Structures are given as structure tokens and as C-alpha cells.
């Protein structure tokens, strides 16, 4: 394991958060779900259910796409399946963005506008940012909670004990998600200017030729990863550009999780950290997920 270098920011997190809020940064309360552009409904849902154990918990049909919410290891994902994939074909399936709860949608709109961040979709009760000024991420904002308010699910969300003890992957929840960017300093400047964050650690990862900064954003840890030379991060950026690279789950037993995937014909690969294994996009309907023992 590569030693982590503390930024020294954590002890002053509350004070720094107050200062950030005063200068117009967005205070996110809770992550709601991670958004994925999927190529097809039946095959993606079958894979997510059979291999990852996903629950199909909400259906949102529409004229442009079929959207659904699925629950995997304590994390909600929204899958958007376009009626026709032609206009998405060159880019392929990918992580579109991530939704956070905020207290005031109107104030958040104003904060984004003041930073020259436009909206690509606004349905009133929620909205998505333009990806280009947001490091390739369409951030979505919502002023309610899927987790702490009543909601009419197709079936009840399975509790943490089920994912930890009853499912063979042994999920312990979301560990972090990673964002790959070509320019590390510019990426950190964006997050510092846009959101209330608490920087936790910095480290170099020579085995992936990557530079990493980890920070707390609401109830999630985000890892910003940039290339330091030729390697998997550089290749990822050449193919997909800036944006969400991977979602990392904690698991009770990494060997047991690997055995589960092997039973489905999937061999896990080395992840972006020395203690993670990954299911690669080619084996996971176009998106990378990682697993780390906790």
C-alpha cells in the first residue's frame, strides 16, 4: 500500500467549510445516486442482477430514454437507456454523472450561474449541469432524499446486513468513486471553487502512473486521479476524456468476491489501488467498478 500524505485539512474542516460556503461554494448534503448511460435495457439489467446482485427498485419510462433505479451493495444507480443508441455509439456506455442532495435548488442554480456553469437539463425538481465545465461530469442536484424520506419502491431496499452477510460479494457500501482528469491542478481548483470539500490525502501511485488527491464531498469520498506518465489513467483519458472513471465498493473478503465473479466467468483485474480488484468495462456493460477489502 502506498503511504498517504495527509493534507492537514481535516482538523479545520468545519471552519474551512464555513468559509467555502460564504464564498458561494455548494454545500452538498448526501449523495443520492450515480448515473449511467447504458446501451440496452434487458442485457444490462440481466448482468447487473445476475453478476452484481442488483435490485430493480424503480421504473421511469420516458419518450427519450428508459430510466430505472437499481440498488447495488447499498448504492443507488440510475440507468438511462436511450431509445436509439446511435448518437451515443462513439462514446459508448459510461458514467454520466452523480446526484447530490442540496437544501435549496434555486440557490444552487444561482451559485452555478455565478461560476458560468450552465444546465444541460432542468426538470424543476432536479437539474443536471453541463459536463464540459464540470470535468466531464453532469452533476445532478435534488432537494429531497431517496434514503431518508418515504418513497414508493418496487420492492424494499435490502438492508446493509443483507449486502454484507447474505450476498456472496459481501458489500460493505461505497468506499469512494474516482474522477480521472488530464490536469490535476485545474481539477482540484474546480472542486475547491464549486463545492464545500475537505481534502484528506494525496499520494502517488507509480503502478498506474497516477497522482491522486482524495477529498470528502458530502457523505462520499472522491479520488481525483491524473496521469504522471504512460499507463492506464493516460489510456483512459485518451479514450474517454475527463469524467468519472470508477465506483469502488468495500467488501468483507476480497478473495470471496473474486470467487463469486469467477463463478460468473469474470476474472477481476488489478484496480487503481494496490488493495483493489476491478471488473473492467468490457466485462461490466461498459463501466468500471472496483472492490476493496474493509
Predicted region positions:
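A structural feature that tracks compact, well-ordered secondary-structure segments
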Residues: 80-82, 99, 103, 111, ...
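Short, solvent-exposed interaction modules
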Residues: 90-97, 108-110, 239-245, 257-259
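Short amphipathic beta-strand starts and helix->beta connectors
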Residues: 19-21, 80-85, 160-164, 227-233
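A broadly used, surface-exposed interaction patch
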Residues: 77-82, 87-100
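Accessory, usually C-terminal, subdomains that scaffold auxiliary metal cofactors
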Residues: 206, 231-238, 243-250, 264
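Vicinal oxygen chelate
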Residues: 2-25, 109-170, 213-217, 223, ...
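N-terminal beta-strand motif that seeds the catalytic metal site of vicinal oxygen chelate
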Residues: 2-45, 93-100, 147-188, 244-247
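Core segments of cupin and vicinal oxygen chelate
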Residues: 20-29, 35-76, 107-114, 120, ...
Amino acid at each position: 500500500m502506498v503511504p498517504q500524505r495527509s493534507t492537514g485539512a481535516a482538523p479545520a474542516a468545519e471552519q474551512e467549510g464555513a468559509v467555502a460556503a460564504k464564498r458561494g461554494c455548494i454545500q452538498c448534503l448526501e449523495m443520492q445516486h450515480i448515473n449511467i448511460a447504458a446501451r440496452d435495457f434487458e442485457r444490462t439489467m440481466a448482468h447487473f442482477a445476475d453478476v452484481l446482485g442488483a435490485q430493480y427498485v424503480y421504473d421511469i419510462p420516458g419518450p427519450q430514454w428508459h430510466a430505472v433505479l437499481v440498488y447495488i451493495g447499498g448504492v443507488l444507480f440510475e440507468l438511462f437507456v436511450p431509445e436509439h443508441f446511435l448518437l451515443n455509439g462513439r462514446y459508448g456506455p459510461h458514467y454520466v454523472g452523480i446526484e447530490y442532495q442540496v437544501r435549496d435548488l434555486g440557490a444552487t442554480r444561482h451559485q452555478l450561474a455565478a461560476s458560468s456553469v450552465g444546465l444541460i437539463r432542468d426538470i424543476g425538481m432536479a437539474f443536471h449541469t453541463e459536463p464540459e465545465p464540470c470535468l466531464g461530469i453532469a452533476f445532478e442536484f435534488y432537494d429531497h432524499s431517496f434514503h431518508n424520506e418515504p418513497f414508493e419502491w418496487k420492492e424494499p431496499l435490502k438492508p446493509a446486513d443483507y449486502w454484507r452477510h447474505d450476498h456472496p460479494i459481501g458489500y460493505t457500501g461505497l468506499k469512494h468513486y474516482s474522477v480521472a482528469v488530464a490536469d490535476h491542478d485545474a481539477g482540484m481548483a474546480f472542486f475547491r471553487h464549486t463545492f464545500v470539500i475537505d481534502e484528506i490525502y494525496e499520494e502517488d501511485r507509480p503502478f498506474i502512473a497516477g497522482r491522486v488527491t482524495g477529498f470528502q464531498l458530502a457523505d462520499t469520498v472522491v479520488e481525483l486521479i491524473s496521469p504522471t506518465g504512460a499507463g492506464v489513467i493516460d489510456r483512459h483519458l485518451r479514450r474517454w476524456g475527463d469524467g468519472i472513471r470508477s465506483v469502488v465498493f468495500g467488501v468483507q473478503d476480497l478473495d470471496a468476491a473474486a470467487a463469486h465473479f469467477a463463478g460468473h466467468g469474470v476474472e477481476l483485474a488489478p484496480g487503481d489501488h494496490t488493495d483493489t480488484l476491478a471488473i473492467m468495462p468490457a466485462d461490466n456493460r461498459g463501466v468500471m467498478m472496483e472492490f476493496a477489502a474493509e
